[in-house]
Amino acid sequence: RPVELVVVDNKSDKVEAANAVKRLTEHEKVLAIIGTYGSSLAMAGGEVAERAKVPVIGTSCTNPLVTQGKKYYFRACFIDPYQGAAAATYAYKNLGYKKAAVLTDVANDYAVGLSNFFKKSYKKIGGELVADMKYSSGDQDFTAQLTELISKKPDIVFMPAYFAEGAIIMKQARELGATFVLMGADAMDNPDTVKIAGKAAEGFMQTAFPYDMTMKDMNDQAKAFTEAWKKNFPNKDPNVNATLGYTCYDMIIDALKRAGKADREAVTKALAETKGLATPVGIMTLNANHDAEIPVGILKYENGKRIYLGEIVPE
């Protein structure tokens, strides 16, 4: 029996996200949903899915609250406490940076959460936090914050921004003569980051999901995904949500096979029991909170290209 894929656009809006899930559960009568990328969108749609008792797997919704107390919501990604701790560990232990600062979008739950987890972990392992700067979504001029950061002389600045905003920050930082290393998180993982930032992206680092086309040791599932992507989109590199969407599909098909029937409750139960599943982002096991236990990847930008450095396990 073939699998039918029904696509609905949530328009990156919380109200539309809830409406999209309602349409899929009530009108399309879907068995399961491959969920959204943003945590706020996932939480808005998740409430609808919970009431409808339809299993959902989010792609890159990393806020811990997404799955907290939810029976029907799962995710194919790690969560922000783990990612923030990994960034702090890499900055302090692997790079040897003893002084850090953060630059946070206070209007974004994702950014606020990640910054808090980074700060807590960085100080816990011995690092010194020299500045804690803020801005709001939509800001275009970061001169004041960057000037203050330059005066504090951090070794590294952690900024969990979305890629378009983060690229602007990179450009303005270099124009002001900043020499500190800039480090972002998974929301910066987009091929357009370099296109927007240009030469200012040189030396930028970020945490990422454990897949990239530059990986030296790609597993069989990652190879299969990459080959399929290149065949269908020869002029475009895959982004992280494409990889995780593919992973979510694998997880649903695996759960459906183990459930033995196309039943929402049976598939939900099988998803909760996901363990040791080979996927493009590694061996997938879901914990009791329905969160994926996968490593955190590290990317660096050199000579206009992304380089996958490997994985990090936080302290």
State each model region's role.
Residues R1-E4, H27-A32, R51-P55, G69-Y72, ...:
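Loop/turn elements at helix/coil->beta-strand transitions in domains of secreted/extracellular proteins
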Residues V48-A49, L114-F209:
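Extracellular/periplasmic bilobed ligand-binding domains
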Residues L24-Y37, I57-T59, A101-T104, K153-F163, ...:
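Periplasmic-binding protein-like
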Residues A17, A76-K99, V112, D141-T143, ...:
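Hydrophobic alpha-helical segments within soluble ligand-binding/sensing domains
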Residues R1-Q68, A76, Y135-F142, A164-A167:
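Beta-alpha junction/loop-to-helix N-cap segments that form part of ligand/metal-binding clefts
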Residues Y73-S137, I156, P234, I252:
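An alpha-beta-alpha
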Residues M170-Y246, K257, K300-P314:
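Extracellular/periplasmic periplasmic-binding protein-like sensory domains
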Residues W229-T243, M251-K305:
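Segments of small-molecule ligand-sensing domains
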